[in-house]
Amino acid sequence: MKRRFQIAVAIERTSEYGRRFLQGVANFFDDKPNCQLALLNPSQVTDRTLDEHDGWICRITNKRMLTKLHDTGKPVVDAICLTPFRGFSTIRTDYSAIGTLAAEHFLAHRFVNFGFCGYRHVTFSDLRRNAFVRVLEERGFRPNIYRPPYLPNRNQPTPAQQLGLTEGPLGEAEDAECLSTWLRRLPKPVAVFCCDDFRASDVARLCKRLRLGVPDDVAILGVDNDPVYCMFSSPRLSSIDPDALALGHAAAELLHRQLSSRKAHRPLARTIPPKGIVMRASTDSYPGAPDWFADAMSYIENEIRTGLSASDVFRHVGYSRTLVERVFRKVLGKTVQEEIAEVRIRAAKQLLRTTAMPIKDIAAETGYRSIEYFTRKFKAAVGHPPAAYRLTGTPPRSRSES
């Protein structure tokens, strides 16, 4: 008879990220009836609950919580890993990949002016910013960084804010004034990457107040794909999906492995790549291009599975082949068919990195007529066949780091 485990999950559940993470945990344990889950608040990490549970998945928000959990000697998966403790297993999103994805997205849209908007002294914001800046500087660009005002005793982040568990820093009026000044002074058009969707909604709201067009003057990209912020902004916000569902699933898998092992549990670490960018109107802009160009690009992205050709794009936008090709060469430096091929490869790479989908299904999903044709084209573009890329790139969903 299998041993029964009582598992405590202490994760905030007010945000979409937290709820998706919890869903991932629940999905993993759904077919494991010997594992009973209890959803707790961080404040409920007490001597009694520590005794009652065999393992923990939590966001460790302070040293007191860390000490209490460590003293039990029980398996713990820290689901934030900003200042990791060597004795615990950890699960974290790939902050560097998020910043890199944002930079590459804006570069693909041919922006030359860039900005970053985050928080003061908040680790996840700093890590995303650093990767964003590094990629742009490698391409010869110098992004403008918004630096929130220093307000003694008022906008220093609390432990919860440091972990991204509350909505923004203190001193909101002063912050809004400084952010408005920063937005006004940015060279236009500009692409602004925000460390999360709450910050992106701040920028969108202030752009409206300043009569700055989004995305024509200011393109905005957030992180977390939180429907409350993304769908209630006008226009709706594009956002990077960190794949909280996969993070929760991986955290549960880590804990279950340790609970099920008869050997002393060795701390493990996993880093999960972002799922990708959820495109909405706030980044639907290509500086210097005619109005129909963004529609053409969206059409290519949305119809890639159908195996579309350049002729389909010409028909969709309603302009001549000569005109459309001339604009594509001017804006992107490539033909329409070359852009279609690049979008296909980019989509395939994303699926190979972030899913366990069979390669034949990836070929179909990205519009290739056969797995052989897909493999040949992918190898020509990337230098490796799809299977080798999956092994040498970021493994799907669960990169282990011992």
Whereabouts are the PLM-identified features?
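Bacterial carbohydrate/catabolite-sensing allosteric modules
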Residues: 1-55, 63-316, 325, 330, ...
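Short, positively charged patches
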Residues: 60
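A secondary-structure capping/hinge motif
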Residues: 328-336, 376-389
